[in-house]
């Protein structure tokens, strides 16, 4: 009842998806609905439509829509919960990764850059130790060259050519501390040429012709210049060792003490998850593909077929019993789980008496019958068929409501005892009075069966036997149809009579009805007019074919009323 085929398509809010979610059934069938379709449903509009529908909805339709709304909302909530959980886990992992390694470089690696653009060109005059002197302050350099150091070579041929070079002590640096450059590792040190390569004295020399001559150990020890060079080299090594320790102390001044930094707080949940990820995963069992075994017995013997035919009923009963036991066991297990889940006493002990009051009481059949007998059926609303498009545009049903409401009270008390398929109950109900149909149809004297009608009915009854039934429940359906037609005809009579009185006792058929009516409605009105004319309720006159039809009241029938 109240079923409209367009309610699932014309309404916005995804009513079609809600209907499918309610009627598909199991969770496996719900996988047919895509995530895009479920997320497109507007829950607010759907709830407003179900709660405050613009037109009456069937009970089954409204219940299915409510179930579908809950299922769609549950799916939308599960999608949202999974997204939030995934994002939360990612954020916690990144946070723990950063806190465990505080000095990690988080800059994005640009692999498309050219390494040559990031490297400085090599400069042979660049000395990085210069920037470490006295808190990154360079001393002023004064190169004073003593020309007297460039002496002429002596007559002694044993003197080395290296002795003609100027002394390294002539290159001095004027600073506020009066330090020499050779006293600091970070300065420009022009050492003596005798200690040019290593700290040990050279074991060779150049002669007058430029040839290399090896020197013995005695010559090296006897030469005072070589001994001075060795002493100078030893002094330089000690100074460099001291200066290196001083430089290291200065460098540590700018370093960060790792012991002062706060310890990272590990997130236990994330650590456990990372630990579990590093563990080797357990091997999963491969799904064994089930194959159909070939049937070796291609043919069945006659004896086997006869046994199957004889024991068919017993085998079906046994299979049905097994199926029933299996289902009953599964359903009982599900009921136990539901009872554990919906145990209201576990939430709060004060809810138990309130929930017991809401449970329906188990009444006996006798009590139900007693309750049904005491119901006043005249006040109970019975479902009616929805009026079609033609019924909404019939003018005589609309205009006759005020005239037909006179006898509504008496008709509601008596009612009609015709049964309809809508009254599918154990006890009899009476049809309620419709305001668009008057209850009294006896106002027309010619509606009663005349002598001609009685003769015709007697002749028809002689030709048909008593056991002849053309259709099932024909008498009952014809009685209901005749009652509806008589009420429609009575409504048209009241409508036409009012129009004739307003038009001074006569009116044409074209002016009786509005011009915007459809052709089936006009045909139904003409049928009612001819039916009332045959029963002497109206006087109908037409001068020539296809001309105007004049309608007036029959004064005899009016006086009788």
Curated annotation (Swiss-Prot):
UniProt keyword list: Chromosome, Meiosis, Nucleus, Phosphoprotein
GO molecular function: ATP-dependent topological DNA co-entrapment activity; chromatin binding
PTM: Phosphorylated during prophase until after meiosis I.
GO cellular component annotations of the record: chromatin; cohesin complex; condensed chromosome, centromeric region; meiotic cohesin complex; meiotic spindle; nucleus; pericentric heterochromatin
Biased composition (Polar residues): 223-241
SUPFAM superfamilies in the record: Winged helix' DNA-binding domain (SSF46785)
Domain of life of the organism encoding this protein: Eukaryota
Pfam families: Rad21_Rec8, Rad21_Rec8_N
Annotated InterPro entries: Rad21/Rec8-like (IPR039781), Rad21/Rec8_C_eu (IPR006909), Rad21_Rec8_N (IPR006910), ScpA-like_C (IPR023093), WH_DNA-bd_sf (IPR036390)
Subcellular location: Nucleus; Chromosome
An example Gene Ontology biological process: homologous chromosome pairing at meiosis
Region annotation Disordered: where it falls in the sequence: 223-247, 401-436
Extent of Low complexity compositional bias: 401-412
Gene3D superfamilies (alphabetical): Structural maintenance of chromosome 1. Chain E
Family: Belongs to the rad21 family.
Function recorded in the entry: Involved primarily in the early steps of meiotic recombination. Required to ensure reductional chromosome segregation.
Assembly and interaction partners: Interacts with moa1.
PANTHER family from the UniProt entry: MEIOTIC RECOMBINATION PROTEIN REC8, SCC1 / RAD21 FAMILY MEMBER
Record's protein name: Meiotic recombination protein rec8
Species name: Schizosaccharomyces pombe (strain 972 / ATCC 24843)
Taxonomic lineage of the native organism: Eukaryota, Fungi, Dikarya, Ascomycota, Taphrinomycotina
